[in-house]
């Protein structure tokens, strides 16, 4: 996640787990599949946090700054018909997150903007505060008033779908076969369950189901004595040519080129 200018990932998300597994000989798959959340708060002072998609479901509308200014000057009303999203989807701001994230990114590049706006001022403010108290509180910390001020948002790298290829027990795979003693659980793993986009509320599946399967497999192998020869069967750490590695330029400077 830290390869990207805008990400919801913590600062420790630098790909070390995938790199270590790769050097141990594990298969790495689908690294090009990254889910971007369409509406993270854009701010130069704080780490991006998610503006829930439920806010768009409640009636919030995506607009460029120019569209928002013209809409205000015209007297307000429902801003949906003025949104750039209609150029990308007949569903406007209510389309799926992959469509919306791609549309926002395309529009930002087209006009040279760092963000677009999520407009809520046409909605009932009291109802918004009741339905989205946490969002309102976080926005208030940034001096943004929900139901009054437009919210600056930008797509943010949210979830790495690819990673260390694993089997149904979370065992890392090497040349299509499970490796002894190496398991990958959570976002570092590529389970193959998601396709090219993350399934919603995947923590239960990735963190709980797979960790449960992995732990039961490890306990079973220990009880049967299969772990006794583990050390001698581990592959050598692949470290050739490390002295010749050159630090890659991250995506952040590339975006400024």
What are these regions (language model features)?
Residues 1, 21, 182-184:
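Short hydrophobic core segments
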Residues 1, 33-42, 46, 188-190, ...:
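Acidic, glycine-rich active-site loops and adjacent beta-strand->loop/helix elements
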Residues 1-8:
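Flavin (primarily FAD) binding-site architecture
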Residues 9-22, 28:
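Thiamine diphosphate
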Residues 9-14, 43, 199-200, 206:
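Short, glycine/acidic-rich beta->alpha junctions
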Residues 20, 26-152, 208, 217-220:
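An anion/pyrophosphate-binding glycine-rich loop and adjacent beta-alpha core
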Residues 57-58, 160-162:
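Short loop/turn microsegments at loop-to-beta-strand junctions
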Residues 63-94, 104-107, 159, 165-184, ...:
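Glycine- and aromatic-enriched mobile tails/lids
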């Amino acid at each position: 996640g830290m390869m990207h200018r805008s990400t919801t990932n913590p600062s420790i998300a630098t790909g070390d787990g995938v790199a270590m597994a790769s050097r141990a000989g594990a298969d790495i798959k689908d690294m090009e599949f990254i889910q971007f959340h369409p509406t993270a708060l854009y701010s130069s002072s704080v780490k991006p946090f998610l503006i829930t998609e439920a806010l768009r479901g409640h009636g919030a509308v995506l607009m460029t700054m120019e569209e928002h200014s013209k809409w205000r000057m015209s007297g307000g009303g429902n801003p949906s018909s003025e949104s750039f999203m209609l150029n990308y989807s007949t569903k406007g701001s209510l389309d799926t997150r992959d469509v919306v994230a791609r549309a926002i990114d395309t529009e930002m590049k087209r006009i040279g903007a760092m963000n677009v706006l999520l407009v809520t001022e046409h909605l009932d403010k009291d109802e918004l505060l009741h339905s989205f108290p946490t969002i309102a509180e976080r926005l208030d910390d940034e001096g943004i008033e929900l139901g009054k001020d437009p919210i600056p948002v930008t797509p943010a790298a949210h979830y790495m779908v690819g990673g260390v290829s694993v089997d149904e027990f979370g065992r890392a795979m090497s040349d299509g076969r499970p490796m002894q003693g190496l398991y990958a659980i959570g976002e570092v793993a590529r389970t193959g369950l998601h396709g090219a986009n993350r399934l919603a509320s995947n923590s239960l599946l990735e963190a709980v189901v797979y960790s449960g399967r992995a732990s039961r497999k490890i306990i079973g192998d220990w009880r049967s004595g299969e772990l006794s020869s583990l050390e001698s069967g581990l592959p050598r750490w692949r470290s050739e040519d490390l002295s010749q590695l050159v630090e890659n330029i991250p995506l952040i400077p590339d975006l400024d080129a």
